[in-house]
């Protein structure tokens, strides 16, 4: 799959409790990854905050967006309970993180190839949220790591999931490659 023009911008979707400063930091880092490695979109990036009701609303927006694009019917989207459950779980864990002060982040490349895009989701990024003992640099590296999975997947010419898994190779290779590339790129960019 070829790279897209830089004018084809990622679509970011944030829960309504995610502050503007966090949104701006995430978008800036994502554009840095695109500048570093090229634009392998179209891309959707869904970010949950720390409020479960806001996460529910984001899940509603996810379904509305899928229906509007013609990817799924409303009924099909509502049957995909794991996405809603994932958003609510992310918010619950982020709320606990803010109370405890123990940072964590869940993020992932979630496929989307059947809809002609790369789909990502993320919990509340603790470094960009300003949580003590959390470094924004770690959030940047996580984002670069996940974007590298889109690059890995963009170079496979089949939509058959089993065949894709076989072509990607062992999990340690896929994850190790993404982590290596993310660490090297973010370290170099921060040093420049």
Report residues per predicted region.
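Acidic/histidine-rich, surface-exposed loop or edge segments in extracytoplasmic proteins
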Residues: 2-20, 121-129
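Hydrophobic beta-strand segments of well-ordered beta-sheets in folded domains
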Residues: 8-12, 41-45, 117
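Zn2+-dependent metallopeptidase catalytic core
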Residues: 15-105, 140, 144-147, 154
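Zinc-dependent metallopeptidase catalytic helix centered on the HExxH motif
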Residues: 108-191
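Generic serine detector
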Residues: 5, 21, 25, 73, ...
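Short, conserved catalytic or adaptor-binding loops enriched in Gly and charged residues
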Residues: 2-4, 35-38, 111
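Alpha-helical protein-protein interaction elements
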Residues: 4-6, 29, 137, 164-165
């Amino acid at each position: 799959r070829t790279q897209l023009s830089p004018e084809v911008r990622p679509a970011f979707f944030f829960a309504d409790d995610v502050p503007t400063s966090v949104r701006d930091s995430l978008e800036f880092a994502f554009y840095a990854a695109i500048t570093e490695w090229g634009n392998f979109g179209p891309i959707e990036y869904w970010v949950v905050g720390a409020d479960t009701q806001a996460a529910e609303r984001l899940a509603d927006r996810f379904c509305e967006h899928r229906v509007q694009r013609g990817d799924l019917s409303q009924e099909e989207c509502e049957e995909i309970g794991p996405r809603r459950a994932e958003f609510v779980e992310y918010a619950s864990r982020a709320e606990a993180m803010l109370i405890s002060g123990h940072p964590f982040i869940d993020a992932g490349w979630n496929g989307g190839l059947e809809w002609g895009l790369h789909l990502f989701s993320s919990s509340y990024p603790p470094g960009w949220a300003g949580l003590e003992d959390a470094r924004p640099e770690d959030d940047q590296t996580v984002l670069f790591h996940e974007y590298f999975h889109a690059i890995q997947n963009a170079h496979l010419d089949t939509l058959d999931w089993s065949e894709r898994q076989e072509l990607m190779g062992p999990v340690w290779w896929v994850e190790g490659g993404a982590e290596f590339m993310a660490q090297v790129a973010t370290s170099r960019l921060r040093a420049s």
